[in-house]
Curated annotation (Swiss-Prot):
It catalyses: allantoate + H2O = (S)-ureidoglycolate + urea. SUPFAM superfamilies: Galactose-binding domain-like (SSF49785). The lineage of its organism: Bacteria, Bacillati, Actinomycetota, Actinomycetes, Mycobacteriales. The keyword Transcription regulation does not apply. Belongs to the allantoicase family. It comes from the Bacteria. GO terms for biological process: allantoin catabolic process; purine nucleobase metabolic process. InterPro entries: Allantoicase, Allantoicase_dom, Galactose-bd-like_sf. The gene is alc. It comes from Nocardia farcinica (strain IFM 10152). This is Probable allantoicase.
Length: 329
C-alpha cells in the first residue's frame, strides 16, 4: 500500500499532538452540573495551573481549576461538557489534577458526541447517546494523568465525569483536526489551518514555542503565541513539516512574523511534496522582515501538494503560516 501524508505522523506520544479543546483554539466549557468552588472554564485555559497558598475567597481556598462541592455520600457524579475548538479525532487526553491533593476525584470517565449545528448547551448535556471513550479509571492527585484513546471517529464535544466529585485543574484533549466535510470545497481554503485538518508532522526545534501554534486560527497575541527555535551555532537552518488539510493547489503563502522583532528569521523557503512523492519548490528562499505579515504568490504547480516543508534561515520565530488554495486539483 502506498504511504500517504496522513500516515506520516511523527512517531511521538499523543501529547505531542495539538490540544483540540484549548480556549485559544475556540474551545468552550458549555455546561457543568456544579462549579461551586472553582469555575468550569478553567479546565481549558492554555497556561499551566497555578497555586497561591492561603489565598481565600468567600468559598474557601482559591483553586485554578474546576471544583465541585462534596457529595457527602449522596448519589450521583459531577460532569462538565466541553465543545472542542477544533472538532477531530481524539488520540488521548490528559486529566491534570495539579494542586488538588485532598480534593481530587478518585476516578473519572470520558464520553463524546459528534453534533451538527449549534443546539443549546442544556440539550447537549441531556442527550443519552454519549459514546464512552474512557471507562471509569482511577486518577492520582496533584498529577498529570494521561490516557490514550483508541477511537478514530470525529468528535465535536466531550463530557468529563468525576466519580463522585472533587477538583480537576485542566483537561487536555490531544488529536488531529477534522473539519466538517460539508463546509470544505465551498471556496478557497487555508490548507495549513489546524481547524481544516492540517497537522505539524515534525520540526527541527521547538525550544521556545510549539510549532502547532503556527496553524492556530486568528492572529497571534504575543511572541509566545508562535513557534520559535533556539539560536543556532552551526551552519544549518531550522524547518517545520506540515501535512495539509488535504491534497490541493496552493496559490498564496502567508508567513507572519508578528511580535518577532530581534528574533525573526532572515529568510524562508517553502517546498511541497505532491501525491506521487515529487518535491516541488513553491517559494524560493525569500527575505523576511520582523513583525510583518508577508504574503507571497506561490509557484504554479500542476500536481496536488499534500505536504509542505518550511525552511527558515537560519533560525528564529514565526507567528502563523497560512497556505491558501483549493482542495483537489
Amino acid at each position: 500500500m502506498n504511504e500517504t501524508a496522513a500516515d506520516r505522523v511523527a512517531p511521538r506520544g499523543f501529547t505531542e499532538l495539538p490540544d483540540l479543546a484549548v480556549r485559544s483554539l475556540g474551545g468552550a466549557v458549555i455546561w457543568a452540573d456544579d462549579e461551586f468552588f472553582a469555575e468550569k472554564e478553567n479546565l481549558i485555559v492554555p497556561e499551566a495551573p497555578e497555586f497561591r497558598p492561603a489565598t481565600y475567597g468567600h468559598r474557601g481556598q482559591v483553586y485554578d481549576g474546576w471544583e465541585t462541592r462534596r457529595h457527602r455520600g449522596l448519589p450521583g457524579d459531577d460532569a462538565a461538557v466541553v465543545r472542542l475548538g477544533v472538532p477531530g479525532v481524539i488520540h488521548g487526553v490528559v486529566v491534570d489534577t495539579s494542586w488538588f491533593t485532598g480534593n481530587y476525584p478518585p476516578a473519572i470517565s470520558l464520553s463524546a458526541l459528534a453534533i451538527d449545528g449549534y443546539p443549546p448547551a442544556a440539550d447537549i448535556a441531556a442527550r443519552t447517546d454519549w459514546v464512552p471513550l474512557l471507562d471509569r479509571v482511577p486518577v492520582r492527585g496533584d498529577a498529570r494523568n494521561p490516557f490514550p484513546i483508541p477511537s478514530r471517529d470525529r468528535w465535536t464535544h466531550v463530557r468529563l465525569t468525576m466519580h463522585p466529585d472533587g477538583g480537576i485543574a485542566r483537561l487536555r484533549v490531544h488529536g488531529e483536526g477534522r473539519p466538517d466535510p460539508a463546509l470544505l470545497g465551498l471556496g478557497p481554503v487555508d490548507l495549513a489551518a489546524l481547524e481544516n485538518g492540517a497537522l505539524v508532522l515534525d520540526c527541527s526545534d521547538r525550544f521556545y514555542g510549539s510549532p502547532h501554534q503556527l496553524l492556530h486560527p486568528g492572529n497571534a497575541r504575543r511572541m509566545g503565541d508562535g513557534w520559535e527555535t533556539a539560536r543556532r551555532r552551526d551552519d544549518g537552518n531550522d524547518w517545520v513539516r506540515i501535512r495539509l488539510a488535504g491534497p490541493g493547489l496552493i496559490r498564496l503563502a502567508e508567513l507572519d512574523t508578528s511580535y518577532f522583532l530581534g528574533n525573526s528569521p532572515a529568510a524562508a523557503r517553502l517546498t511541497g511534496r505532491t501525491t506521487d512523492g515529487t518535491e516541488v519548490e513553491l517559494l524560493p528562499r525569500t527575505p523576511l522582515q520582523p513583525d510583518t505579515r508577508h504574503r507571497f504568490p506561490t509557484a504554479a504547480v500542476a500536481a496536488s501538494v499534500e505536504e509542505v516543508r518550511l525552511d527558515i534561515y537560519p533560525d528564529g520565530g514565526l507567528a502563523r503560516v497560512r497556505l491558501f488554495g483549493e482542495l483537489g486539483g
